[in-house]
Amino acid sequence: MMRVPHSIARVLLVIGISVLTLSACVSDERRSRYSQPIPHYDVPAQVIYRIDDHRYVSFENYSDCFHGDAFYIDTRLGIRTDLGREGVENFQGKLINADPSGRNLVFPMAAPPHTACSDRSCSTPLIYSTDSGRTFHGMVYMKTFNPFNRSKDYTMAVNGDRLYVAEKIQDDAYVIEYPLVQGIDLTKPYPPGVRGSSFTASWRPTYLSGLRTPSGQERFTCDASIRPKNNAAELSQ
Protein backbone atom coordinates (compact mmCIF):
# COMPACT_ATOMS: atom_id res chain seq x y z
CA MET A 1 0.00 0.00 0.00
CA MET A 2 1.21 3.48 -0.80
CA ARG A 3 2.90 5.14 2.17
CA VAL A 4 2.64 8.91 2.19
CA PRO A 5 5.01 10.83 4.50
CA HIS A 6 3.27 12.06 7.66
CA SER A 7 3.79 15.74 6.82
CA ILE A 8 1.99 15.27 3.49
CA ALA A 9 -0.68 13.00 4.94
CA ARG A 10 -1.63 15.70 7.45
CA VAL A 11 -2.26 18.17 4.62
CA LEU A 12 -4.44 15.70 2.73
CA LEU A 13 -6.42 14.81 5.82
CA VAL A 14 -7.19 18.49 6.38
CA ILE A 15 -8.87 18.68 2.96
CA GLY A 16 -10.92 15.59 3.71
CA ILE A 17 -8.98 12.92 1.82
CA SER A 18 -7.98 9.96 3.92
CA VAL A 19 -4.59 8.39 3.35
CA LEU A 20 -6.28 5.07 2.61
CA THR A 21 -8.08 6.50 -0.41
CA LEU A 22 -4.77 7.51 -1.92
CA SER A 23 -4.13 3.87 -2.71
CA ALA A 24 -6.90 1.31 -2.40
CA CYS A 25 -9.49 -0.34 -0.21
CA VAL A 26 -7.97 -3.77 0.25
CA SER A 27 -9.20 -7.05 1.70
CA ASP A 28 -8.67 -7.81 5.38
CA GLU A 29 -6.02 -10.37 4.43
CA ARG A 30 -4.04 -7.91 2.32
CA ARG A 31 -4.54 -5.13 4.89
CA SER A 32 -3.08 -7.43 7.53
CA ARG A 33 -0.09 -8.13 5.29
CA TYR A 34 0.49 -4.43 4.64
CA SER A 35 0.26 -3.66 8.36
CA GLN A 36 3.33 -5.81 9.01
CA PRO A 37 6.73 -4.13 9.29
CA ILE A 38 8.38 -3.61 5.91
CA PRO A 39 11.25 -6.10 5.46
CA HIS A 40 14.77 -4.89 4.87
CA TYR A 41 15.59 -5.81 1.29
CA ASP A 42 19.22 -6.44 0.36
CA VAL A 43 19.34 -4.12 -2.64
CA PRO A 44 21.51 -1.14 -3.63
CA ALA A 45 19.96 2.30 -3.95
CA GLN A 46 19.01 3.32 -7.48
CA VAL A 47 18.73 6.82 -8.92
CA ILE A 48 15.32 6.69 -10.61
CA TYR A 49 15.09 10.37 -11.52
CA ARG A 50 17.96 12.82 -11.86
CA ILE A 51 17.57 16.59 -12.08
CA ASP A 52 21.28 17.45 -12.29
CA ASP A 53 24.63 16.40 -10.86
CA HIS A 54 23.58 16.98 -7.24
CA ARG A 55 19.77 16.58 -7.19
CA TYR A 56 17.98 13.29 -7.70
CA VAL A 57 15.42 10.79 -6.40
CA SER A 58 16.93 7.76 -4.67
CA PHE A 59 14.97 4.47 -4.66
CA GLU A 60 15.75 2.25 -1.68
CA ASN A 61 14.61 -0.87 0.19
CA TYR A 62 12.58 -2.15 -2.76
CA SER A 63 11.27 -5.59 -3.62
CA ASP A 64 10.84 -4.59 -7.27
CA CYS A 65 10.48 -1.41 -9.33
CA PHE A 66 6.96 -0.72 -8.01
CA HIS A 67 7.38 -1.26 -4.26
CA GLY A 68 10.07 0.73 -2.49
CA ASP A 69 11.01 3.88 -0.59
CA ALA A 70 11.82 7.11 -2.44
CA PHE A 71 13.93 10.00 -1.14
CA TYR A 72 14.70 13.39 -2.62
CA ILE A 73 18.43 14.09 -2.38
CA ASP A 74 20.33 17.36 -2.80
CA THR A 75 23.98 16.70 -2.00
CA ARG A 76 24.95 20.36 -2.34
CA LEU A 77 22.42 21.54 0.25
CA GLY A 78 22.59 18.40 2.39
CA ILE A 79 18.90 17.56 1.86
CA ARG A 80 17.42 14.07 2.17
CA THR A 81 13.61 14.14 2.26
CA ASP A 82 11.28 11.13 2.49
CA LEU A 83 8.89 11.00 -0.50
CA GLY A 84 7.00 7.93 0.68
CA ARG A 85 6.66 4.31 -0.44
CA GLU A 86 4.91 2.87 -3.52
CA GLY A 87 4.25 6.35 -4.86
CA VAL A 88 6.52 8.36 -7.15
CA GLU A 89 8.22 5.29 -8.63
CA ASN A 90 4.88 4.27 -10.16
CA PHE A 91 4.22 7.50 -12.07
CA GLN A 92 4.31 6.64 -15.78
CA GLY A 93 3.90 10.10 -17.27
CA LYS A 94 6.31 12.87 -18.22
CA LEU A 95 8.03 14.97 -15.54
CA ILE A 96 10.04 18.17 -16.05
CA ASN A 97 11.69 19.99 -13.14
CA ALA A 98 13.08 23.15 -14.74
CA ASP A 99 12.96 25.92 -12.13
CA PRO A 100 16.31 27.70 -12.59
CA SER A 101 16.31 28.82 -8.93
CA GLY A 102 16.01 25.22 -7.70
CA ARG A 103 13.39 26.22 -5.13
CA ASN A 104 10.30 24.76 -6.79
CA LEU A 105 9.92 21.03 -7.41
CA VAL A 106 7.15 18.58 -8.20
CA PHE A 107 6.96 14.78 -7.96
CA PRO A 108 3.70 13.08 -8.95
CA MET A 109 2.66 9.75 -7.49
CA ALA A 110 0.69 6.76 -8.75
CA ALA A 111 -0.10 3.30 -7.38
CA PRO A 112 1.55 -0.02 -8.29
CA PRO A 113 0.12 -2.01 -11.23
CA HIS A 114 -3.11 -3.90 -10.57
CA THR A 115 -3.95 -1.85 -7.47
CA ALA A 116 -7.61 -2.40 -6.60
CA CYS A 117 -9.43 0.86 -5.93
CA SER A 118 -12.60 1.32 -3.92
CA ASP A 119 -15.95 1.85 -5.62
CA ARG A 120 -15.22 5.61 -5.43
CA SER A 121 -11.86 5.30 -7.24
CA CYS A 122 -8.34 6.07 -6.03
CA SER A 123 -7.43 9.68 -5.25
CA THR A 124 -3.85 10.08 -6.44
CA PRO A 125 -1.58 12.89 -5.20
CA LEU A 126 1.36 14.90 -6.39
CA ILE A 127 3.80 16.48 -3.97
CA TYR A 128 5.49 19.83 -4.48
CA SER A 129 8.09 21.93 -2.71
CA THR A 130 8.81 25.66 -2.65
CA ASP A 131 11.89 25.42 -0.42
CA SER A 132 14.31 23.37 -2.54
CA GLY A 133 12.94 20.04 -1.37
CA ARG A 134 13.32 20.47 2.37
CA THR A 135 9.56 20.08 2.82
CA PHE A 136 6.76 18.97 0.52
CA HIS A 137 3.02 19.61 0.38
CA GLY A 138 0.47 17.33 -1.24
CA MET A 139 -2.61 17.69 -3.42
CA VAL A 140 -4.72 15.28 -5.44
CA TYR A 141 -4.31 15.57 -9.21
CA MET A 142 -6.22 12.50 -10.39
CA LYS A 143 -9.17 10.32 -9.39
CA THR A 144 -9.29 7.04 -11.26
CA PHE A 145 -9.80 3.30 -10.94
CA ASN A 146 -6.46 2.61 -12.64
CA PRO A 147 -3.86 5.08 -11.33
CA PHE A 148 -0.82 3.27 -12.75
CA ASN A 149 -2.00 3.26 -16.37
CA ARG A 150 -3.88 6.57 -16.20
CA SER A 151 -0.76 8.36 -15.00
CA LYS A 152 0.65 7.80 -18.52
CA ASP A 153 -1.73 10.53 -19.71
CA TYR A 154 -0.15 13.23 -17.51
CA THR A 155 2.69 15.67 -18.00
CA MET A 156 3.95 17.65 -14.99
CA ALA A 157 6.31 20.58 -15.36
CA VAL A 158 7.75 23.29 -13.10
CA ASN A 159 9.08 26.45 -14.72
CA GLY A 160 10.14 29.20 -12.36
CA ASP A 161 7.07 30.04 -10.27
CA ARG A 162 4.57 27.91 -12.23
CA LEU A 163 3.44 24.29 -11.98
CA TYR A 164 1.73 22.83 -15.03
CA VAL A 165 -0.43 19.71 -14.74
CA ALA A 166 -1.49 18.55 -18.19
CA GLU A 167 -3.90 15.67 -18.81
CA LYS A 168 -4.00 14.22 -22.31
CA ILE A 169 -7.56 14.04 -23.65
CA GLN A 170 -7.80 12.49 -27.11
CA ASP A 171 -5.72 14.71 -29.43
CA ASP A 172 -5.37 17.60 -26.99
CA ALA A 173 -4.47 18.20 -23.36
CA TYR A 174 -6.22 20.07 -20.56
CA VAL A 175 -3.70 22.08 -18.56
CA ILE A 176 -4.03 23.54 -15.07
CA GLU A 177 -1.45 26.20 -14.23
CA TYR A 178 -0.75 26.53 -10.49
CA PRO A 179 1.23 29.37 -8.90
CA LEU A 180 4.27 28.40 -6.86
CA VAL A 181 5.20 31.06 -4.33
CA GLN A 182 7.05 30.47 -1.08
CA GLY A 183 5.01 28.32 1.30
CA ILE A 184 1.81 28.26 -0.79
CA ASP A 185 -0.84 25.64 -0.01
CA LEU A 186 -2.48 24.78 -3.32
CA THR A 187 -5.42 23.15 -1.54
CA LYS A 188 -6.49 26.51 -0.07
CA PRO A 189 -7.51 29.89 -1.57
CA TYR A 190 -4.51 31.67 -3.03
CA PRO A 191 -3.03 34.76 -1.34
CA PRO A 192 -4.12 38.17 -2.69
CA GLY A 193 -2.67 38.88 -6.11
CA VAL A 194 -1.66 35.26 -6.74
CA ARG A 195 -3.49 33.53 -9.58
CA GLY A 196 -3.53 30.36 -11.60
CA SER A 197 -5.25 29.48 -14.84
CA SER A 198 -6.42 26.62 -17.03
CA PHE A 199 -6.38 26.15 -20.78
CA THR A 200 -6.10 23.58 -23.55
CA ALA A 201 -2.69 22.85 -24.98
CA SER A 202 -3.98 23.61 -28.47
CA TRP A 203 -4.79 27.15 -27.31
CA ARG A 204 -1.29 27.69 -25.88
CA PRO A 205 0.82 25.17 -27.82
CA THR A 206 4.15 26.69 -26.73
CA TYR A 207 3.53 26.62 -22.97
CA LEU A 208 6.27 23.99 -22.48
CA SER A 209 8.55 25.32 -25.22
CA GLY A 210 12.18 25.15 -24.18
CA LEU A 211 11.44 23.51 -20.83
CA ARG A 212 13.68 20.61 -19.89
CA THR A 213 15.06 19.00 -16.78
CA PRO A 214 18.78 19.95 -16.65
CA SER A 215 19.78 16.28 -16.95
CA GLY A 216 17.37 15.76 -19.83
CA GLN A 217 15.49 13.04 -17.91
CA GLU A 218 11.71 13.24 -18.25
CA ARG A 219 10.52 9.92 -16.78
CA PHE A 220 11.21 7.75 -13.78
CA THR A 221 13.40 4.79 -14.68
CA CYS A 222 14.28 1.67 -12.71
CA ASP A 223 16.54 -1.32 -13.36
CA ALA A 224 14.13 -4.24 -13.01
CA SER A 225 16.97 -6.76 -13.06
CA ILE A 226 18.02 -5.77 -9.54
CA ARG A 227 16.11 -7.90 -7.06
CA PRO A 228 16.60 -8.68 -3.35
CA LYS A 229 19.10 -11.41 -2.52
CA ASN A 230 17.50 -12.10 0.86
CA ASN A 231 15.78 -15.43 1.17
CA ALA A 232 12.28 -15.80 2.63
CA ALA A 233 13.58 -16.74 6.08
CA GLU A 234 15.79 -13.66 6.27
CA LEU A 235 12.95 -11.36 5.19
CA SER A 236 10.61 -12.77 7.85
CA GLN A 237 12.99 -12.05 10.70
Cite the ranges covered by each PLM segment.
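Short aromatic loop motif centered on NTY/YTY
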Residues: 140-187
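Bacterial signal peptide processing site
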Residues: 26-29
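Bacterial N-terminal signal peptides that target proteins for export
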Residues: 2-12
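C-terminal motif of bacterial Sec signal peptides marking the signal peptidase cleavage site
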Residues: 21-24
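Beta-strand-rich domains and repeat architectures in extracellular enzymes and scaffolds
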Residues: 36-71
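Short beta-strand elements that form the blades of beta-propeller/WD-repeat-like
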Residues: 49-63, 101-120, 153-170
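Conserved Ser/Thr-centered positions that define the repeating blades of beta-propeller domains
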Residues: 73, 127-135, 179
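Repeated scaffold domains used in trafficking and secretory/extracellular systems
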Residues: 42-46, 88-100, 143-156
